[in-house]
């Protein structure tokens, strides 16, 4: 029976500093590096056929660390921005507490946790293209890639590991667990903890749990 492992990258430096990160390419914090090592220890005994990550270094480093610990540094890998974190627009780089003070906690919650309301798209130094995404927008780019590239591997009987981000993984889990828009808003994916999905030979999920 094939396994699918989903893992959010270890804590990043901006997670630690409580800043909106999005597509800004921030490295892991020391704690995040340790979380990646702990994930590797938990995954000893698992053998993978393919790995997928976003193009952001915090996800790449997390997967590289895991593969080093489990002795699979030659695993075929595919990196794609479809698995990137949600783009937080003009909020990228800003402290969440400061945003709450400036715009109010309710507005902060809407930008962070609503399904279809994106943050402001104003151009900034960290958002030169004026981009911004809601969770709905993130799912619209993540899920087609997941269904076209990742699930065919799983359905072919391959064991797959995906290292990505809170919101791209929320999009995937929403589909796999058949969550409603309301349910996914309450879903929190912790950093650095492998989430296992076990499939049967017909492509049905037999079990899923955190390791």
Regions found by a protein language model. Name each.
Residues 53-54, 162-164:
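Short beta-strand scaffold positions
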Residues 11-69, 128-146, 185-186, 194:
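Loop-to-helix element that buttresses phosphate recognition and phosphoryl-transfer chemistry
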Residues 166-171:
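GST superfamily/GST-like fold recognition
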Residues 45-47, 149-158:
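Glycine-rich phosphate-binding loop signature in dinucleotide/nucleotide-binding domains
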Residues 112-138:
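Conserved C-terminal alpha-helical bundle
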Residues 1-5:
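Extreme N-terminal starter segment of soluble prokaryotic enzymes
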Residues 38-112, 116-121, 174-198, 202:
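Phosphate-coordination/substrate-recognition cap region in phosphate-metabolizing enzymes
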Residues 9, 165:
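Histidine-centered divalent metal-coordination motifs
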């Amino acid at each position: 029976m094939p396994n699918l492992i989903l893992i959010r990258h270890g804590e990043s430096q901006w997670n630690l500093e409580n800043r909106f990160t999005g597509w800004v390419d921030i490295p892991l914090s020391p704690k995040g590096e340790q979380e990646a090592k702990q994930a590797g220890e938990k995954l000893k005994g698992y053998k993978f056929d393919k790995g997928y990550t976003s193009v952001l270094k915090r996800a790449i480093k997390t997967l590289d660390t895991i593969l080093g610990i489990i002795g699979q540094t030659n695993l075929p890998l595919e990196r794609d921005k479809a698995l990137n974190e949600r783009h937080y627009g003009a909020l990228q780089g800003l402290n969440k507490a400061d945003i709450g003070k400036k715009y109010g906690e309710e507005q902060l919650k809407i930008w962070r946790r609503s399904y279809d309301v994106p943050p402001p798209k104003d151009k900034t130094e960290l958002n030169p293209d004026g981009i911004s995404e809601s969770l709905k927008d993130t799912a619209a780019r993540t899920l087609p890639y997941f269904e076209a590239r990742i699930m065919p591997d799983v359905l072919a009987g391959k064991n797959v590991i995906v290292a990505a981000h809170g919101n791209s993984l929320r999009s995937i889990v929403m589909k796999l667990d058949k969550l409603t828009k309301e349910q996914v808003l309450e879903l929190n994916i912790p950093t650095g903890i492998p989430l296992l999905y076990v499939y049967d030979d017909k492509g049905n999920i037999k079990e899923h749990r955190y390791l």
